[in-house]
């Protein structure tokens, strides 16, 4: 059978439909391609924004860390300025603020302990002295724990306990003695040229050498064994302190007190008077001079 004849109008209509179909397919393809490009653009933009955000965040963190470090340095320097003038009430708040940022900084903890000892010296009430002393001791222990290779940090507990001794009950005095020796030994193992450590060791030996056998026996029965000290070793310890740092009056006065305990009165007067003639340069110098005068009065 022959196909039915197609009129010119029908033929034109079919041609238009084919064009429309072909055009629609092309348009759909173009739209699909456009959508793919848009999607890729969005992904790239999101990735770029994320990276920019990450870089900006890191930069801000670095700025914050740098600012914090700078802030701590500024606080400590301001604190040192007050400390040089023995103004503990002004130095302490600055150091405590710095501690919030660096709670494990041994040098800072040593400085804080020192300010509490300064306040302890200024306090008129023994109860208040002990309260401040225990705070200083806590910071001293923390300094020692955070600075195992720091001489000043290891020595801090010994200095604080020595400052507290006159106000402690007898039982605690006995318990403190081996702790002081342990602290000094650790400090000297780190720095054998620490005049502070030799001074404290000399005082430790002098005080314990003064305890009679009878008192030592009774103390051992009631409070526990008391370490033994040597007055001869005390003399050598203090001479080492002077040789290392001859500019501190406390070394001379303490050596004079050692000689007084040994019965060597002329040498006692010589060294105590030498210390008394030197200018006050440290917070405890007036207190040290007073002890020297009391010793002279008994000679």
Give the label of every model feature segment.
Residues 249-287:
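C-terminal/domain-terminus segments
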Residues 66-102, 106-121:
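N-terminal leader/linker segments that initiate helical-solenoid repeat arrays
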Residues 82-90, 114-149, 156-193, 203-241, ...:
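Short coil/linker segments at helix-helix boundaries
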Residues 43-54:
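Bacterial N-terminal signal peptides that target proteins for export
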């Amino acid at each position: 059978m022959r196909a039915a004849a197609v009129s010119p109008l029908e033929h034109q209509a079919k041609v238009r439909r084919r064009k429309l179909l072909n055009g629609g397919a092309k348009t759909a393809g173009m739209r699909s391609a456009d959508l793919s490009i848009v999607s890729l653009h969005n992904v790239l933009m999101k990735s770029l924004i994320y990276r920019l955000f990450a870089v900006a965040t890191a930069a801000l963190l670095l700025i914050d860390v740098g600012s914090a470090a700078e802030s701590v340095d500024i606080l400590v320097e301001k604190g040192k300025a007050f400390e040089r003038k023995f103004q503990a009430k002004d130095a302490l708040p600055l150091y405590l603020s710095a501690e919030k940022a660096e709670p494990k900084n041994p040098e800072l903890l040593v400085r804080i302990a020192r300010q509490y000892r300064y306040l302890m010296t200024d306090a008129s009430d023994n109860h208040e002295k002990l309260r401040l002393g225990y705070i200083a001791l806590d910071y001293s222990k923390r300094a020692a724990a955070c600075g195992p290779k720091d001489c000043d940090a290891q020595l801090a507990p010994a200095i604080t306990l020595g400052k507290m001794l006159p106000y402690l009950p007898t039982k605690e005095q006995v318990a403190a003695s081996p702790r002081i020796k342990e602290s000094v030994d650790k400090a000297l193992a780190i720095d054998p040229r620490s005049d502070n450590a030799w001074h404290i060791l000399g005082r430790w030996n002098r005080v314990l050498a003064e305890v009679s056998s009878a008192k030592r026996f009774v103390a051992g029965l009631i409070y526990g064994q008391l370490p033994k000290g040597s007055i001869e070793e005390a003399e050598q310890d203090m001479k080492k302190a002077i040789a290392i740092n001859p500019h501190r009056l406390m070394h001379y006065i303490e050596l004079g007190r050692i000689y007084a305990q040994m019965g060597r009165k002329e040498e006692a007067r010589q060294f105590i008077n030498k210390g008394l003639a030197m200018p006050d340069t440290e917070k405890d110098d007036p207190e040290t001079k007073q002890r020297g005068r009391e010793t002279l009065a008994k000679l």
